[in-house]
């Protein structure tokens, strides 16, 4: 089966918005063992849409068309498909009824232009949109099924999960088994990872890919066919042996997600005191529903005065060692934990740059501490040559990983090999 995607819209083509739908779609389908082999972006020009629908329908088996189903004059996907098929547009009585009910239910007056959304190419199969006004539909042209969906992300994603994937599984025999394993690494670049893992011989049916979203690189092991799936545990073990502590999580997207889930399940609590990370540790956790069950407080104590008055850091410690020091960050973590009696507390203090560094403590020097009931773990990491944003993101990730390792009963301070450090 050959799957392609056509994305529509001048704003996407011009780069005015980032097409997150396409990335999500390809990643979601890959998890089902369905590879998207081509993606095309087309602007809001009727003749271009007609041409690309005709052309790709002779090459692909199924085509996801995203966007252009709205009520405005530049929403042209439905009209273009009808022209490509050589059929008229006809009103779907079923969708018009649903459309009118949607506006009534939401206490809104339906504009006459919205009736355009009930028009479908003659012979089209209506695809329900349970959360919006744009009617999805599927048509057969030449060798391809074309599946039309709205560009609104939450509408699109729901229709893919509830309508498109079952449609594909019904229309095409997807009998071959697939398995995907994802490993999250911290601090390394793609080229470095590729060089290190080049020693691993991949059996037939197993592929290894990388996805960068710094500070993380995700390694994806994809196996197609039972023989390849059976070999996956051995390949995974080889990857882990090569990368060691560089692997910080499995089958999740970010460390904050793992920390959130582990704290939820453990019933343990956390406080956070941040300087150079400026709330990033706290913000990452608050993004997940239910974080109030474990997150006691998130304090941004940027100034020395705040460190002293809010966290109880000894002013003599600041005078003797400076704000960016293991001694200071340990007192920050201890103070944050003590305010509300949290089980754990994380603290950071560093020089994110681009200015403020010294010979002894250059830009990229960050102190991180984890306070527990039994003691304090701390380390100073050196992140030279990174942007301010990346220094802060890496520092946040290292703090998360220290807590993750503590929750798992592992060594809290480890060598990531991708940046230098020293600890107390």
UniProtKB/Swiss-Prot annotation:
Domain of life of the native organism: Bacteria
PANTHER family reported for this sequence: NICOTINAMIDE-NUCLEOTIDE AMIDOHYDROLASE PNCC, NMN AMIDOHYDROLASE-LIKE PROTEIN YFAY
HAMAP family in the cross-refs: CinA_B
Family named by the database record: Belongs to the CinA family.
Protein name stated in the entry: CinA-like protein
């Amino acid at each position: 089966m050959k799957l392609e995607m056509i994305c529509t819209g001048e704003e996407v083509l011009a780069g005015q918005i980032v097409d997150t739908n396409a990335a999500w779609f390809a990643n979601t389908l890959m998890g089902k063992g369905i590879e998207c082999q081509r993606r095309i972006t087309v602007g809001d020009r009727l003749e271009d849409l007609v041409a690309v629908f005709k052309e790709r329908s002779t090459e692909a088996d199924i085509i996801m068309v995203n966007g252009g189903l709205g009520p405005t004059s530049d929403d042209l996907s439905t009209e273009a498909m009808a022209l490509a098929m050589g059929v008229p547009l006809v009103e779907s009585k079923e969708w018009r009824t649903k459309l009118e009910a949607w506006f009534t239910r939401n206490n809104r007056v339906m504009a006459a232009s919205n009736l355009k959304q009930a028009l479908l190419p003659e012979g089209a199969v209506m695809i329900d949109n349970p959360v919006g006004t744009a009617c999805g539909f599927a048509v057969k042209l030449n060798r391809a099924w074309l599946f039309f969906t709205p560009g609104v992300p939450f509408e699109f994603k729901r229709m893919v999960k509830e309508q498109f994937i079952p449609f594909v599984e019904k229309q095409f025999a997807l009998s071959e088994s697939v398995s995907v394993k994802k490993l999250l690494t911290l601090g390394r670049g793609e080229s470095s990872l590729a060089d290190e893992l080049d020693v691993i011989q991949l059996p037939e049916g197993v592929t290894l890919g990388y996805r960068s979203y710094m500070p993380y690189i995700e390694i994806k092991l994809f196996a197609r066919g039972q023989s390849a799936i059976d070999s996956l545990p051995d390949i995974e073990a080889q990857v882990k042996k090569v990368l060691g502590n560089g692997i910080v999580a499995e089958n999740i997207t970010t460390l904050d997600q793992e920390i959130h889930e582990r704290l939820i399940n453990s019933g343990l609590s956390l406080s956070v005191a941040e300087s150079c990370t400026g709330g990033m540790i706290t913000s990452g956790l608050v993004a997940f529903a239910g974080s109030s069950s474990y997150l006691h407080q998130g304090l941004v104590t940027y100034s020395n005065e705040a460190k002293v008055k809010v966290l109880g850091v000894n002013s003599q410690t600041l005078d003797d060692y400076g704000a960016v020091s293991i001694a200071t960050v340990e007192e920050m973590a201890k103070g944050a934990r003590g305010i509300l009696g949290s089980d754990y507390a994380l603290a950071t203090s560093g020089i994110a740059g681009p200015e403020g560094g010294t010979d002894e403590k250059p830009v990229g020097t960050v102190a991180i501490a984890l306070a527990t009931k039994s003691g304090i773990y701390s380390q100073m990491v050196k992140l030279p040559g990174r942007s301010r944003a990346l220094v802060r993101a890496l520092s946040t990730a290292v703090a998360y990983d220290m807590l993750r390792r503590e929750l798992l009963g592992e060594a809290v301070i480890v060598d990531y090999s991708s940046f230098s450090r020293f600890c107390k």
